[in-house]
A protein has these predicted regions:
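Amphipathic terminal alpha-helices
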Residues: 21, 303-324
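NAD(P)H-binding glycine-rich loop region in Rossmannoid oxidoreductase-like domains
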Residues: 44, 53-54, 58-92
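Mid/C-terminal beta-alpha module of Rossmann-like enzyme folds, strongest
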Residues: 186-189, 195, 227-277, 322
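Conserved C-terminal active-site "lid" loop/helix of NAD(P)H-dependent oxidoreductases
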Residues: 221, 275-299
Length: 324
């Protein structure tokens, strides 16, 4: 049995979908549905049990993992990069992950967890996933800091030889519909095109950067989860790995791809970036994928335009269809 935390969320539900594609259905999902629309992400998936995240943690602390658990894929977290409640992030992202990691190590169970490219901060220290460089990283948000704390703790406890952490870069795609302001630019652009035939993008406020040329390592969720599930293979060594394409693309590239997939000519309004975002805004990210490639992990390779076309034409134009 495989446990997937955050299994009703964006990446977590896509992990369950990928497991289903490989014939795996004995899956326990851990999440908090509340009054959100996340339950739609589960409707087409096959799994054997659902646990509320708080009850699961109480059971974990009282008696450890379920005896038949063979692996834990821990995608559950507060993923809002603008969350300001540091205590909430410390509990939900740091302490919850620590408790789960300890239980997995004690039981000899494979542990795969989500770190983030937000740990790289402004990128001045590069984007190498060499664990020896962790101490040099300076995240720009409390979200990134919470992920950094987990990476440092995993290394300090000596768990990284038996666990795999993925530093996700900019993931977009199917099943992200519930994410509010954390929706990808691809989805936001589609919504604007669908409703107003135009898209708003932040104008550059930094000298030397043209409007729209801020780059990200955009990663299609279908590619991302193939690599995550591959890490269940014990032949993949433990450690922290970047998860991106290794190919930076601009926001303008992405928006143009959405217009093209929707069969429209680009029509863009440039708007000023809010003051509160300017100090923590990244102008360039790109995953160094050498380490992942050396251990045989699949490097996501779907071209941006092809991924956007699949997302827009296969799902968004079909009424926000879900995976499964």
């Amino acid at each position: 049995m495989i446990i997937v935390t955050g299994g009703a969320g964006f990446i977590g539900s896509a992990v369950v979908w990928e497991l289903n594609r490989r014939g795996v259905e004995d899956i326990h999902i851990v999440d908090h549905l509340g009054t959100t629309e996340k339950w739609h992400n589960l409707a087409n998936l096959r799994y054997s049990e659902y646990h509320h995240k708080d009850q699961f943690l109480r059971d974990l602390r009282a008696g450890g993992l379920p005896k038949d658990a063979s692996a834990v894929i821990h995608m559950g977290a507060c993923s809002s990069t603008t969350e300001r409640d540091a205590d909430y992030l410390m509990f939900n992202n740091v302490h919850y992950t620590r408790d789960l990691a300890r239980a997995c190590m004690a039981a000899g169970v494979r542990f795969i967890y989500a770190s983030s490219a937000a740990t790289y901060g402004d990128g001045s220290q590069g984007y190498s996933d060499d664990e020896a460089t962790l101490d040099r990283l300076r995240p720009m948000s409390i979200y990134g800091y919470s992920k950094q704390l987990v990476d440092l703790w995993m290394r300090r406890e000596g768990f990284l030889d038996r666990a795999v952490g993925f530093k996700f870069f900019n993931v977009f795609g199917v099943n992200e519909y519930h994410k509010g302001e954390m929706r990808s630019m691809a989805l936001k652009a589609w919504e604007r095109i669908h409703e107003h035939q135009r898209v708003k993008l932040f104008a550059s406020h930094r000298q030397g950067h043209a409007d729209g040329d801020e780059t990200r390592d955009f990663l299609y969720v279908k590619d991302a989860v193939r690599t995550v599930v591959q890490a269940l293979d014990p032949a993949i060594p433990g450690g922290i790995y970047n998860l991106g394409t290794g190919q930076p693309r601009s926001f303008l590239d992405m928006v143009k791809a959405v217009f093209s997939a929707a069969g429209r000519e680009p029509d863009i309004d440039w708007v000023a970036m809010p003051e509160e975002l300017r100090g923590q805004y990244q102008y360039y990210t790109c995953a160094d994928m050498d380490k992942a490639a050396k251990v045989g992990l699949a490097i996501p390779s779907t071209p941006l335009e092809e991924a956007i076309r699949d997302y827009v034409q296969g799902y968004l134009m079909a009424g926000r269809a879900h995976l499964g």
